[in-house]
Amino acid sequence: KLAVYGCEVIFHKVCDDDPAGITAAILEAKAAGCGLIFTTGGMSVDPDDRTPLAIKNTGAEIITYGAPVLPGAMFLVSYLDGVPVCGLPGCVMYAKRTIFDLLLPRLLADDPITAEDIARLGEGGLCLNCEVCHWPNCGFGHC
């Protein structure tokens, strides 16, 4: 999904499900000059999923954890000194279209995401997983 927009991945680190290690990796990514930071894994409501806590522990301002969009309800968006730090739910790895598709263009354009923006996605926030996908020429993400 990043390649479509010509994005270059300049930092990648695999972490255990340990908040301190994830926090350190996020801060390391920021120090490396990443303009967008994405975390994957550990985003559900399971007590063992620690990524939201790790993002919070960076000092990032959490805009929202949770979205009225399927797939992608467990999405987290925050800002760490102006750098977006997003917790991506597992669906971004397997679903054709998710909340990530709706928000990535805005993140790349440095268009700040607000809690109100996320709430507005509730109208049109259900991807119907059509056999032949016509997104963005469908109702998904359009309110």
Question: How would you label these PLM feature ranges?
Answer:
Residues K1-C143:
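Non-catalytic beta/alpha edge segments that cap or flank active sites
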